[in-house]
From Swiss-Prot:
<comment type="pathway">
    <text>Amino-acid degradation; L-histidine degradation into L-glutamate; N-formimidoyl-L-glutamate from L-histidine: step 1/3.</text>
</comment>
<keyword id="KW-0456">Lyase</keyword>
<keyword id="KW-0369">Histidine metabolism</keyword>
<dbReference type="GO" id="GO:0019556">
    <property type="term" value="P:L-histidine catabolic process to glutamate and formamide"/>
</dbReference>
<keyword id="KW-0963">Cytoplasm</keyword>
<comment type="similarity">
    <text>Belongs to the PAL/histidase family.</text>
</comment>
<dbReference type="Pfam" id="PF00221">
    <property type="entry name" value="Lyase_aromatic"/>
</dbReference>
<dbReference type="GO" id="GO:0005737">
    <property type="term" value="C:cytoplasm"/>
</dbReference>
<dbReference type="InterPro" id="IPR005921">
    <property type="entry name" value="HutH"/>
</dbReference>
<dbReference type="InterPro" id="IPR008948">
    <property type="entry name" value="L-Aspartase-like"/>
</dbReference>
<dbReference type="InterPro" id="IPR001106">
    <property type="entry name" value="Aromatic_Lyase"/>
</dbReference>
<dbReference type="GO" id="GO:0019557">
    <property type="term" value="P:L-histidine catabolic process to glutamate and formate"/>
</dbReference>
<dbReference type="InterPro" id="IPR024083">
    <property type="entry name" value="Fumarase/histidase_N"/>
</dbReference>
<dbReference type="GO" id="GO:0004397">
    <property type="term" value="F:histidine ammonia-lyase activity"/>
</dbReference>
<protein>
    <recommendedName>
        <fullName>Histidine ammonia-lyase</fullName>
        <ecNumber>4.3.1.3</ecNumber>
    </recommendedName>
</protein>
<dbReference type="InterPro" id="IPR022313">
    <property type="entry name" value="Phe/His_NH3-lyase_AS"/>
</dbReference>
<feature type="modified residue" description="2,3-didehydroalanine (Ser)">
    <location>
        <position position="144"/>
    </location>
</feature>
Length: 507
């Protein structure tokens, strides 16, 4: 199996997916370990000289003015972890935990945190051998980083807390023993270095952003299939329209629609059936394109964060300086994930309105609720209800978490990011949006079948065929949630996008 090599500087989102979801192991480059060792020497010298340095020879937060003697440094770090492990709620998914372990190791590999090399090796061994700490999903303010959830990670490094190993839940001590990993006794600065960072919010958000890059393509596919089902007008997607307002996402979406419906006999030109379409069809490039640009903005920000040093204080061995700063503050990610959540929610908003156009006979000209025996059968009536419910929930979830700071640590930490809440909310919005788009794909596949002698576009035909392998045409009412779940799974696992991209290049 391929290994991912880390050095703190050039980890990619794709490599993170390999480690988090495909269980690739990691190695650390020798040069990075040299940097880690050199930085550690600075910490040990400062402890020996009893210099006053935050988190090394002082307490934390409001207690930063309390001096700690060198013979108390190990106890200080242990107390930090056991007191800060205050997470609540359901445990994070295993893929997120693996992402957290990877990102924390990569941040330490930059060589500005001051941990011992063997402490970093313990973290890497846990990831490679499958010791996955049980980390509650709630309890982080997002500044100073993800203190509470990361403390649960470090408990297991110390042989405490809880973990899963080979699919079984057990004590952290037992998991480390079974994996053959000696627990660490934290030394000066190490507890702080391990928990003072944004790796939980970033792991949640990075995995989501990878999925969103597929989701925006899927949204274009769904919109294209609905465009055909509505005998939509292709002129609105002409490149001349979009080059005079050259937002990249808008231009890419317009080109995607044109490519997806190429060869379709259902697509019309302006004036053939109607002069212009409703906004949810005609403005797909502007709506989807804006979300596409927001997603790509988030990709850029996350690529910076996964290679960032988010510790405090930071140690610069070449200058022999230890500087207290604020790189732990999650605001760059909090704003990014709030923005991302809004962008995803809009994909669901417009999709649900297209569903309404498909099931409403006054708008579609098709049988009501896409059933030939309306009255006796309800057809797709309640699928639109479900989509409307999910869209309404998204509107609540899209309220920004980052605007809701609350002071902590006796007002020493008087502005916090709520970035982890923003990431978790964005994931919930994504899951709702997947289900809404799944309904649209089902409804559009049903709708096109009411036309005689039609030909779908090259891309939409592949999407339709993929859907029909899992969800049959609805002749009479049946249990709909089964079909909805099957179609949503095709979205979740990216099957539709992967199949369509075999015949059409999607930007």
């Amino acid at each position: 199996m391929k290994k991912v090599s880390i050095n703190g500087n050039d980890l990619t989102l794709e490599e993170m997916i390999m480690v988090a979801r495909e269980y690739c192991s990691i190695t650390i480059e020798p040069e990075a370990m040299v940097r880690v060792a050199n930085t550690r020497k600075v910490v040990e010298r400062y402890v020996e000289e009893e210099r006053v340095v935050y988190g090394i020879t002082t307490g934390f937060g409001k207690f930063s003015d309390v001096a700690i003697s060198k013979d108390q440094t190990e106890m200080l770090q242990r107390n930090l972890i056991i007191s800060h492990a205050c997470g609540v709620g359901e445990p994070l998914k295993e893929e997120v935990v693996r992402g957290v372990l990877l990102l924390r190791a990569n941040a330490l590999a930059k060589g500005y945190s001051g941990v011992r090399p063997n402490t970093l090796e313990t973290l890497i061994n846990m990831l490679n051998k499958g010791v996955h700490p049980i980390i509650p999903e709630k309890g982080s303010l997002g500044s100073s980083g993800d203190l509470a959830p990361l403390a649960h990670m470090v408990l297991v490094m110390m042989g405490e807390g809880e973990a899963t190993y080979k699919g079984n839940k057990m004590s952290g001590k037992e998991a480390m023993e079974k994996a053959g990993i000696p627990p660490v006794v934290l030394s000066a600065k190490e507890g702080l270095a391990l928990i003072n960072g944004t790796q939980v919010m970033t792991a949640i958000g990075a995995l989501l952003i990878y999925d969103c890059q597929k989701l925006i393509k899927l949204a274009d596919i769904a919109g294209a299939l609905t465009l055909e089902a509505q005998r939509g007008i292709i002129d609105a997607f002409d490149h001349k329209v979009h080059r005079v307002r050259p937002h990249q996402g808008q231009q890419q979406t317009a080109q995607n629609i044109v490519n997806l419906v190429a060869g379709s006999t259902l697509i019309t030109r302006q004036g053939e059936v109607r002069v212009q379409d409703a906004y949810t069809l005609r403005c797909i490039p502007q709506i989807h394109g804006a979300s596409r640009d927001a997603i790509m903005y988030a990709v850029d920000k996350v690529n910076i964060e996964i290679n960032g040093a988010t510790d405090n204080p930071l140690i610069f061995p070449e200058e022999d300086e230890v500087i207290s700063g604020g790189n732990f503050h999650g605001q760059p990610m909090a704003l990014t994930f709030d923005f991302l959540g809004i962008a995803i929610a809009e994909l669901a908003n417009v999709s649900e309105r297209r569903i309404e156009r498909l099931v409403n006979p006054q708008l579609s000209g098709l049988p009501a609720f896409l059933t030939a025996k309306g009255g006796l059968n309800s057809g797709f009536m309640i699928t639109q209800y479900a989509a409307a419910s999910l869209v309404s929930e998204n509107k609540i979830l899209a309220h920004p978490a980052s605007v809701d700071s609350i002071p902590s640590s006796a007002n020493q930490e008087d502005h916090v990011s709520m970035g982890t809440i923003a990431a978790r909310k964005a994931r919930s919005i994504y899951e709702n949006t997947v289900n809404v788009l799944g309904v649209e794909l089902m409804a559009a596949s049903q709708a096109v079948e009411f036309y005689d002698g039609y030909e779908l576009g090259i891309g939409t035909r592949r999407a339709y065929d993929t859907i029909r392998k899992s969800v049959a045409h609805l002749d009479e009412d049946r249990v709909m949630y089964v079909d909805m779940n099957r179609c949503a799974e095709l979205v979740f696992n990216h099957k539709i996008v992967d199949e369509v991209e075999k015949v059409v290049s999607i930007l």
